[in-house]
Amino acid sequence: MDHRPGLDPSVAEVRRAVRSALERADGPVAVALSGGPDSLALAAATAFEAARAGIRAEAVVIDHGLQEGSDAVAAAAAEKARALGLGARVVRVEVGSTDGPEAAARAARYAGLAAAAVEIGADVVLLGHTLDDQAETVLLGLARGSGGLSLAGMPAERRDATGPIWVRPLLAVRRHTTVAACAAQGLDPWNDPHNADPAYSRVRVRNRVMPVLETELGPGVAEALARTAEQLREDAEAFQDMIDETIEDIVEHAEAGISISVAALAANPAAVRNRIVRYVVDSEFGVSLSRAQTLEIARLATDWKGQGPIDLPGCLARRVGARIEVVARTAS
């Protein structure tokens, strides 16, 4: 335990969280650094704990190029990492325009981090999301009418099929703790102006909605939302195991897509049926179905009245005899 005389409690809390995360590292680790208080506190704790454990750690600063002077901000963040004893690199990424600005920036950021991790030889990338970020994610999901999987928030650990392990050591740590940890160590974090821009829904939740909830419902709302996410994630993971087993039995590959047994799909409870539809379409085509689209496809099995093909982004769903086919639109 970090209870040495003079060690600030906030610094100790962040270090404990990082120490636990580093236990799963078999080699070098990368730490995502924006220069803000969350990622800077994470970088400082990683520098300390990695040195103690004999683990090489390197900070990766992503320059999205979306703000004037972003290159200088990125360079300053990298210099702070080096001052902490970390290796550091700046990765400039190109943000696409096909999705919304937040989604496009996120996709570019993760791609840049994954590529840097390969160059570093790191199987683990540490991310600085806090308990507050988790609570905001749950609230945003509720406002959008999302399903249980979205309300489960961000996982503490996730591995892509071909990428690194994404680890969020600070999901049980409050944002005010990372701010205090930076102050206690004399670190000067960068304050991203986007984090104060009410044009972003997450900023409105953070600065307007959460304070009202804390005032009206009492303290502990953020912690309660984070607990809800954790419980839903446990349920979702168990549910996904059921879905995987069912899919093996009822889903087959078809030309330019997949096909699903009508009888087997209809025999499942609605929750399982709808999850199967969403999951197989997302897995095959990368399309995230709305609830209305999901139900419309399911009705091809449960309420068949000769409906025509259902247009979806990049693909279409249709009833063909005793099966539902979801195929690329060019194959129709």
Residues covered by each model-derived region:
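An alpha-helix initiation/capping motif
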Residues: 107, 133, 199-203, 207, ...
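Mid-to-C-terminal catalytic subdomains of enzymes
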Residues: 130, 179-181, 185-230, 234, ...
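Conserved Class I S-adenosyl-L-methionine
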Residues: 244-254
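An accessory alpha-helical subdomain
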Residues: 213-242, 260-276, 280-281
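Residues at alpha-helix boundaries and the short loops/turns that link adjacent helices
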Residues: 145, 176, 215-219, 271, ...
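Mid-to-C-terminal catalytic/tRNA-binding core of tRNA(Ile)-lysidine synthase
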Residues: 15, 26, 253-331
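Short, well-ordered strand-loop elements centered on a beta-strand within folded domains, enriched
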Residues: 150, 164-168, 322-332
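Core alpha/beta nucleotide-donor-binding catalytic domains of modification enzymes
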Residues: 1-207, 211
